[in-house]
Amino acid sequence: MCVGIECHGFGDKPAWMDRGARQKAEAAKMKQKVTQVARNRRMNQFRDQNESSLNRIHNRRTSNSQPSTRSINNTTTIPASNNEPLALSQPPSASSQNQVEKDQLSTYHQDSINVAIDPLDTIDSSLPDFQTVFDEINFLTDQTFDLPEIDWTSTNNVPITDNTANMGVTNGLRAGQYVPRSQKQIDMDFSPRDSPSMLTISDVEDAALLAYYVSKVFHWQFRFCSSTMSGFNQGYFIWLMSKSRPLYLASLALSSSYRSFQNNAKEPQPCLKYEEHMQRYDIATEELQGHLKGHTPMNDVTMLACIVSFISSSFLHSGRIDGNVHLKAGVSLIAPRISRQQSGTLSDVHKTPEESSRDFLTGSIIRFDILSAITRDTVPSLSDSYRRILRSSSPSILLETVSGCQNWVFDILLDVYALRDWKRNTRAVGLLSLWELTAKANMIKSDLERRITSNLMLMNESKQEVKTQEDENLQSRHYKHEICVVTHTFACAVSILLEVIVSGAYPQVPEIKQKVGRALESFAYIEDPDILEVLTWPLFVVGCVVEEDHHECFRQLLSSTQLVRSIGLYGLKEILEKCWKSRETGEIKDESFDFSHFHTYKSREILIA
């Protein structure tokens, strides 16, 4: 490429190379010509890129049979300065759409020209070293002398940032992928306000609550989901949260309450004020109600997660958040799913994250529904459907991953509930047969005791394995042992419930006394006090029937410093005190004792689960 500089080849030295004024003047002209050529080349490159970009846009527009209008409606105008907010432009008419695109590209390239770096301009020509070096240049090359390729810098690869952190990733834009401004303006097909996938972390407090939820609250809610069998973990929950504003808000509210409870646990009388968290729960509840009106298959999963979070919150704010109401909503959501599952239309092989999450959260609802029936007058409405799932040889739902207790205990518990309702109904019409009652109870008892014996053997074996074998599978064996311990504790409590239904709540009756003693021994197998967090139901059953000599033992256990931070057991001591007082005063007779007497406490319904 000719730059208009005369080349003297290998001849005599030109007259102007006198190391004086003439040489400096000639050097200045050379510099000017080189600079001009560099600028011309840069402009040609910009022009070629402009035409190429327009061609790409034209091809993309003509290749789509139904061009999207939403992308233009949501086009983001880049502010002139960082202090100006992002503004959404008005949608152009169809006739001017092509001109808008050209103007946008023109603006983008003009900005690129303004910020482009001139390699020669970056050197200060006033410096002595520069002038000396330039003066010594001898263009003694052949006649085809050409300039080297000059690198240029544009804004194509400069990411456009926003001061707001967002959960979720937009279509066509992934973390770490830089998109030119023009492409981002035209292809952006979302509005943070309108898209449910974009959840704004509005301030540092929300970010702190989110981090606290992932590190602390999740483990409290789903202690046993760390197993690979659960098909669920923190990552899945965050993924669901990124798709649901109600779930995101409910999780932050729960995190706020949980953190406050833990901070106040050191007080002599820990008290959690709902008013401090009321605004968060109110907004989350409003969002949940709106989404329940028009749910989709994906919404079903996120709504289940949201409902489970509200049920967990009810243990912290039982006087303000009715867990039973949310549980009913959850049951109504899983009912169609369970109906399809028992017809064999669903497969548990190669589950997607959505399917795995749905099964896990469905198991959480089933767990709450079955256990809470202890204080209700009837069995769960979906008992038959639950049985089919729990008795499956390869169940897609494992309740041990949500409660630590295996499926067979919940299956037998449903049979015990059914016996309770049968006895109540036949007695009401004067047709109760004690012989028939005993026969039905013995069938359940035989199966239950056989299972307890088998699980006890597994528990002892797993204990020995944990003690004697230390390798990469130690954590898995420890998890297996914990499942056996929790399952044994629940099963012992179910055996007490069965005896109470048959004989009444007489602590001195040999059968009941023996079952209560075995249940108390089951608590001795627990090595980690945190496991008591999931044993509210067994502690409630055993505590209501235990002899008076053991009342003080329960008081000390539930008031111990190890359990003062236990949310699952929060308020259980007061409920047991009410039960003991009612029995001591004769308000509730042993022969007519029923756990449903304690479905309310301080004029509010309670949820034992």
From Swiss-Prot:
Residues 46-104 are annotated as: Disordered. GO terms for cellular component: nucleus. Residues 85-97 have a biased composition (Low complexity). Transcription factor; part of the gene cluster that mediates the biosynthesis of meroterpenoids. This is Transcription factor ntnD. Signal peptide: none annotated. InterPro entries: Fun_TF. Residues 51-84 have a biased composition (Polar residues). Keywords: DNA-binding, Metal-binding, Nucleus, Transcription, Transcription regulation, Zinc. It holds the Pfam family Fungal_trans_2. It is found in: Nucleus. GO terms for biological process: positive regulation of transcription by RNA polymerase II. It comes from the Eukaryota. It comes from Nectria sp. GO terms for molecular function: DNA-binding transcription factor activity; metal ion binding; transcription cis-regulatory region binding.
